[in-house]
């Protein structure tokens, strides 16, 4: 048998996450793992199991998910990238397929991961091309969010940022980066002679006058708990909206209780950006 590693990109909007779901009471929902295994099994003529580096949730995207699979030696030299992409739906794409040592494991060999969460600083209007990939939050206090983010750096017990439904051994993780950056160009508001914003639209007009751009938050760690990034993002947005002071973060970490932290951020703003080996 030969072990192959895949780099996979996908738009999670219409996918039920990475992992095949164990259910027999209803039709299996569409998953990334399921779509890839469907094609691999058709080529090999026998069941093929893929192992992903991260189990992204329903609605979460990926730019560079990594997975591995074992195939018969006589199938190892096929043009697997072309074969996958010829049969995959348009929301999943294989960027690369390479042969790796037999002992390589996409999940257990990973030293860390980087996720990006995108925010759109306006709630009344979102460009259609951004709507599936960014949380429209409205204007936020970025300085307060920066101050709160600083408390998340380093080794901590992140039990307050873990959702239920996992059997992990420890909730201690080391976060090496929580930082924001702007992406893309600001949409241009046409300068219309004598134009005045209508009632209720002043916030949008003022925001566009200042230049609207996507705010991307990068989270890097040696590993993440279930929905940990979305829960940290939910905290930072709550701080940005003035619902919590930045210095509330240490107490939330110390509590080790999910109920002490704000609500989970929506799935659609999150993208798995990179797996580190």
From Swiss-Prot:
The active site is at 57 (nucleophile). The keyword tRNA processing applies. One of its GO terms (biological process) is tRNA pseudouridine synthesis. Its EC number is 5.4.99.12. Gene3D superfamilies: Pseudouridine synthase I, catalytic domain, C-terminal subdomain, Pseudouridine synthase I, catalytic domain, N-terminal subdomain. It comes from the Bacteria. Pfam families: PseudoU_synth_1. Coiled coil: none annotated. Belongs to the tRNA pseudouridine synthase TruA family. Homodimer. This is tRNA pseudouridine synthase A. It comes from Nitratidesulfovibrio vulgaris (strain DSM 19637 / Miyazaki F) (Desulfovibrio vulgaris). The gene is truA.
């Amino acid at each position: 048998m030969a072990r192959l590693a895949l780099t996979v990109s996908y738009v999670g909007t219409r996918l039920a996450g990475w992992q095949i779901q164990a259910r027999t009471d209803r039709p299996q929902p569409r998953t990334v793992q399921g779509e890839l295994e469907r094609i691999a099994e058709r080529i090999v003529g026998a069941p093929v199991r893929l192992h992903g580096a991260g189990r992204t949730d329903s609605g979460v995207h990926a730019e560079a998910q990594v997975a591995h699979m074992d195939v018969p030696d006589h199938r190892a030299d096929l043009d697997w990238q072309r074969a996958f992409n010829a049969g995959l739906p348009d929301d999943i794409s294989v960027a690369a397929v390479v042969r790796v040592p037999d002992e390589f494991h996409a999940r257990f060999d990973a030293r860390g991961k980087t996720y990006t969460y995108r925010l759109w600083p306006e709630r009344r209007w979102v460009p259609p091309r951004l709507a599936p990939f960014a949380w429209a939050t409205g204007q936020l206090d970025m300085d307060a969010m920066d101050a709160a983010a600083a408390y998340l750096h380093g080794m901590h017990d992140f039990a307050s940022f873990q959702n239920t439904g996992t059997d992990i051994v420890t909730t201690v993780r080391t976060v090496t980066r929580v930082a924001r950056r702007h992406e893309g160009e600001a949409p241009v508001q046409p300068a219309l002679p004598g134009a005045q914003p209508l009632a209720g639209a002043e916030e949008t007009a003022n925001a566009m006058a200042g230049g609207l751009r996507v705010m991307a938050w990068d989270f890097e760690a040696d590993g993440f708990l279930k929905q940990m990034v979305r829960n940290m993002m939910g905290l930072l947005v709550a701080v940005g909206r003035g619902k919590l002071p930045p210095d509330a973060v240490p107490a939330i970490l110390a509590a080790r209780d999910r109920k002490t932290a704000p609500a989970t951020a929506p799935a659609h703003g999150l993208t798995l950006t990179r797996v580190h080996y």
